[in-house]
Regions:
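Pyridoxal 5′-phosphate
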Residues: 1-363
Length: 363
């Protein structure tokens, strides 16, 4: 891996901060920087072949159709899914809401349970609270161990025949711990529940194979994987997508409708993609996947682990720093400066050109 060459791919790293310092960007959990190839792909669409997707019957429109559909295939290959199982969304939050309202509200009743953890991002908590509010079902929490990790034993304690949905972050955005997804999937399916995996912090950093993991839904965002904002993915097993109601209705997602209120829906994934899609975002996502693949996810994962070990070693040399997750399997490092308010520490780092996230991290 040629790090100097890779750094040149990101225009923002060539800029100085407002304090005139070189940018040291450590906020990739919130959003990643964008390589020039992604920016170019978006600009190319806006400059050279702007048209709506699956609407027009002229050459430029056909090129948009082909490009749009090619990205769906690219995403499917990236996670080992089928094209028809890949739905484009506005991001992870929207993807979870689509499952919550399209499946949860439709099928859950007052005797049912949804399982999450207290370490989830707000986007994987609030939609389920709304499902509970509308259906009368209960949201319960899988207990974490003393370090904030998910364990098989604690999952077994929480599972029962009333559990219908389990929704978990593959990697927590705060502590960065991974867990045995395949074993969890097996146990969850044994009680007849469905399993949604929030891959916002995993898909950009490691290989995620939906068939191998046997998850029912996988959600993730483009902007955390070198892609643009406003684009995300909902993967769902096709039979489950077929059973779901669409969160939104509008042009392109219907086969027919009449004055009596009868509506015929397209088959998934088009059934969930009402109106004009974020075409530039889709194209940018495709370019981001190409970029990550050109480096190799295995290479990226290994490099992140090396950097994490180095950072932990250096942070431990500073007596006033407390690290909370030095043994996790991801590149997320959570720490405090003793007796210093987190926002004050972040402001100090900022004065040196160092960008970090502080506070509650949406959790």
């Amino acid at each position: 891996m040629d790090i100097k060459k890779i750094r040149l791919d990101f225009p923002m790293l060539n800029n100085k901060t407002m304090q005139g310092k070189p940018l040291v960007y450590f906020d990739n959990g919130a959003t990643s920087l964008k390589p020039q190839c992604v920016i170019d792909a978006i600009c190319d669409y806006y400059s050279n072949f702007t048209a709506n997707a699956h609407r027009g019957d002229y050459d430029i429109a056909h090129k948009v159709d082909q490009t749009f559909d090619a990205v769906r295939s690219k995403v499917a290959n990236f996670i080992n899914a089928k094209d028809k199982e890949v739905v484009f969304t506005a991001g992870t939050s929207m993807s979870i809401n689509m499952v919550a309202y399209g499946y949860g509200v439709k099928y859950l009743t007052e005797n049912d349970e949804i399982l999450i953890t207290e370490a989830e991002h707000a986007s994987n908590v609030l939609p389920w609270y709304k499902v509970a509010e509308q259906t009368g079902c209960k949201v319960n929490f899988i207990e974490l161990d003393e370090k904030g990790r998910l364990t098989v034993d604690n999952l077994k304690k929480a599972l029962n025949s009333n559990v219908k949905i389990v929704s978990l972050a593959h990697i927590s955005n705060v502590l960065g711990y991974d867990f045995d997804v395949k074993e969890f999937s097996k146990l969850i399916h044994e009680v007849g529940a469905i399993f949604l995996l929030d891959g916002a912090q995993s898909v950009p950093h490691k290989k995620v194979d939906v068939k191998d993991l046997d998850v029912d839904f996988l959600v993730f965002s483009g902007h955390k994987m070198c892609g643009p904002t406003g684009i995300g993915v909902l993967y769902g097993k096709y039979d489950l997508l077929n059973k779901m109601d669409p969160l939104m209705t509008g042009g392109g997602m219907n086969t027919k409708f009449d004055m009596c209120g009868n509506i015929g829906y397209q088959h998934p994934p088009l059934k969930f993609e009402a109106g004009t899609q974020n075409i530039a975002g889709v194209i940018g996502l495709g370019a981001a996947i190409d970029y990550l693949n050109s480096i190799g996810l295995d290479v990226i994962e290994q490099r992140e682990k090396e950097l994490k070990r180095y950072a932990i070693k250096k942070l431990k040399e500073v007596d006033i720093i407390t690290i909370y997750n030095d043994d996790n399997d991801s590149g997320i490092i959570t720490f405090n400066v003793k007796d210093v308010f987190a926002q004050d520490a972040a402001s100090l780092f900022n004065s040196y050109g160092i960008a970090v996230r502080c506070g509650e991290h949406c959790s």
